[in-house]
Amino acid sequence: MQSTSNHLWLLSDILGQGATANVFRGRHKKTGDLFAIKVFNNISFLRPVDVQMREFEVLKKLNHKNIVKLFAIEEETTTRHKVLIMEFCPCGSLYTVLEEPSNAYGLPESEFLIVLRDVVGGMNHLRENGIVHRDIKPGNIMRVIGEDGQSVYKLTDFGAARELEDDEQFVSLYGTEEYLHPDMYERAVLRKDHQKKYGATVDLWSIGVTFYHAATGSLPFRPFEGPRRNKEVMYKIITGKPSGAISGVQKAENGPIDWSGDMPVSCSLSRGLQVLLTPVLANILEADQEKCWGFDQFFAETSDILHRMVIHVFSLQQMTAHKIYIHSYNTATIFHELVYKQTKIISSNQELIYEGRRLVLEPGRLAQHFPKTTEENPIFVVSREPLNTIGLIYEKISLPKVHPRYDLDGDASMAKAITGVVCYACRIASTLLLYQELMRKGIRWLIELIKDDYNETVHKKTEVVITLDFCIRNIEKTVKVYEKLMKINLEAAELGEISDIHTKLLRLSSSQGTIETSLQDIDSRLSPGGSLADAWAHQEGTHPKDRNVEKLQVLLNCMTEIYYQFKKDKAERRLAYNEEQIHKFDKQKLYYHATKAMTHFTDECVKKYEAFLNKSEEWIRKMLHLRKQLLSLTNQCFDIEEEVSKYQEYTNELQETLPQKMFTASSGIKHTMTPIYPSSNTLVEMTLGMKKLKEEMEGVVKELAENNHILERFGSLTMDGGLRNVDCL
C-alpha cells in the first residue's frame, strides 16, 4: 500500500498502465471517497523537468464536465514523488465499452451521439485554453454514469498535452500509432527523419479515427496483417487515402486497398446520421494539413449535427425505417426534401400517416411542432407511385472458425469474435421484428384510410346520381315546353340542342352501372377474406409472442459468461489441470450455443421475415392498383358532376327565357288569326286551347323553378360532406 497525506491505495488495485505512469484506485483517508491516483514511474523522471511539470500546468487550467477533473497534486509519503489526485471514473474508458461483444460492430446510435457530444465539448474546452492533447484515443476517453442514467465521456491523460495556439507548431512526438496523424506516424513509427512540423490539427486526425472506431467497432485503416504487424502498408494506407474516403482496408496479403467513403453495412448508425457524419470524417482524416479542416469548421459541423432533432419515418412500401435529422426551426418543405433524399419519394407523392390518420403538414409548419415520434411510433410515408420493396439492409456475417488447439490468448479473441457475431444477430432479429410490427400497423391503418376514401367515393357517387336524376327530369320538362311552343308554329331553335343534352345525360346515367359494379368489386376486396384484407400479415413472419429475440438472448448470455471467463483465463496466462479441462468444455459449449443461436436466427427470424417481405410486396402491389382504380372512379364522379352542372346551368338559362317566349306565343296567336269570321265554336275552342297551353307551360316553369331550388339546397347541404382532398387517394 502507498499513500499521501490525504489518500491511500493498493498497488494491486491498478486501473491502467501507461509509458510514464500507472493509475490506481485510491480512497480519501477521512471520507473513504474513491479517486484515481496517477503515480509516475521512473521513466517519467528521465524527461526534462519542464515536460514533467507540463501535465500539472495543463490540468490546472482545465475545468469542464468533459475533462477528467484534477482535485489535488500531492506527494507520495515514501518517495516524495508528485502524484495526481483525479476524478475516479468507475465505468472504464470508451475502449472498455468498445471491447464489449455487444459493441463489436459499433456503438448504438444514441450512445455514439453522446460520445460525439462529449468529445467535441471537451476538445472545444482544450482549444479555448490553447491546448493540444496529442494522444486522443478511446483509451483516453473515460466514462461515468450521470445523474440521469446516461453516459458522460471525459478526456483524460494529458501527459502528452501542451499549450499550442492554432498557428503554432511542434516537433516532438507523442500518441498511439493506430490513431497518429500520418506525418507523426512516419517519424514516430517508421523512424524516418523529416523536417515537418505539426499543428494543433493533428488532434483532428486522432478524433476522426476514434469516431470511426466508435461508430463501426473497427479501425478505419487496416493492413491485412494488422496495423502493428505491417507498418509500411499502414503508412501507405494513411498517406494514400483518396479525398472523400473514410476507410481503407487490405483484405488479402499484398492485395489492393479497398477504399470507402461510407460506413460498413454492419454499422448501427442510421443513414440519416451517416450522411452528416461521413463528410466530417472525410475532411479531418486528411493527411495534407493544408486540406484538412480547421477546428472552427470541425466544431461548426459537429455542432450542426448535435443541434438537430430526429423525426422517425417508416416507408411502408419500401419497408425501411429512417431517421430524419432536422433543425427544429426547419419547415415542412425541408422535411419533405430530407425524406426524399433517404427514400427517393418526391415531395408531391409523399402521403403521411400518423397514428392512423392522414398527416397534412402545411409548408411553413416548423419541425418543432411536428407530432412526437419514436422508432416504435414513427410517421409512415406512402408513395402514390410504385416503389421497390427493400427491407432491412444488413450484413450477413458468418461465425468465425473455432480452432481446436488449446490457446488462452487465441481462445479469448475467438470468444470475443464469436460472441460479437451472435450479439449482431440478436440486434438484427430485434430490428426485423420491429419492421414487421410496423408493417402490420401501417397496413391496418392504410386499409382503414382506403375504406374512408371508398366511402367518400360512394357518397360522391350518390350525390352525382341524385343531381343527374334531377337534371334529366328538368331537361325532359323543358323539352315538353319547347315542343308545345313548336305546335303553335313558334320558332324554337334551342329544341335540337336540348334534345342533344338530354341524350348525353341519359348516356351519363347509364355509365353509373359500371361505376357501381367497380365500387362493389373494391368493397369485396377490402372486406374480410378479400384480396386486400390484412389477415395474411398476422399469419406470416415473426411475432413478439414467438419470443425469438428472447431465445437468442438466453443463448447470448451463456456465451457472454464464457467470454468473460476466457478473459480471466487469459490474464492468468496458465491454468491448473482442472481449470484447463473446464476451459476446454466451455470452448465446446461456446461453439454449440453460437451454432444453435445462428441456426435459430436463420430459420426462425430471417426466413420468416423474408416470407413476410415477399407477401408485403405482393399486397402493396395490389393496394396500389386498387387505389388507382378508386381514384379513377372518384375522378369519373367529379367529371360527371362537372358535366351535369354545365348542362344544368344551360337549362336554367333557357328556363329564364320561357316567360318571354310564352308572352310572345300569346301575342303571336292574336296577330296570326285569319281575318275571316270563324264560327263561334271555333273561337271558343281556340281560346280554351290557348288557355290550357298557357296553364301547362306555367305549370312546367313553376315545377322547373322548384326543381332548381331543390338542387341548390341539395348542393349546399352536400358541399361540406363531399370529398375535400381527392389528391389524398
UniProtKB/Swiss-Prot annotation:
Tissues of expression: Ubiquitous with higher expression in testis. Expressed in the ganglion cells, nerve fiber layer and microvasculature of the retina.
A Gene Ontology term for the protein's cellular component: intracellular membrane-bounded organelle
Annotated effect of mutating D50A: In IIAE8; decreased expression levels
Originating species: Homo sapiens (Human)
PANTHER family named in the record: IKB KINASE, SERINE_THREONINE-PROTEIN KINASE TBK1
Protein name: Serine/threonine-protein kinase TBK1
Subunit structure and binding partners: Homodimer. Interacts with DDX3X, TIRAP and TRAF2. Part of a ternary complex consisting of TANK, TRAF2 and TBK1. Interacts with AZI2, TANK and TBKBP1; these interactions are mutually exclusive and mediate TBK1 activation. Interacts with GSK3B; this interaction promotes TBK1 self-association and autophosphorylation. Interacts with SIKE1; SIKE1 is associated with TBK1 under physiological condition and dissociated from TBK1 upon viral infection or TLR3 stimulation. Interacts with IRF3, leading to IRF3 phosphorylation. Interacts with RIGI. Interacts with CYLD. Interacts with OPTN and TRAF3.
Taxonomic lineage from the root: Eukaryota, Metazoa, Chordata, Craniata, Vertebrata
Mutagenesis / variant outcome for changing A533T: No effect on IFNB induction
Alphabetized GO MF terms: ATP binding; identical protein binding; nucleic acid binding; phosphoprotein binding; protein kinase activity; protein phosphatase binding; protein serine kinase activity; protein serine/threonine kinase activity
Comment block on domains: Comprises A N-terminal kinase domain, a ubiquitin-like domain and a C-terminal coiled-coil region mediating homodimerization.
Annotated phenotype, changing R384Q: No effect on IFNB induction
Listed PROSITE patterns: PROTEIN_KINASE_ATP, PROTEIN_KINASE_DOM
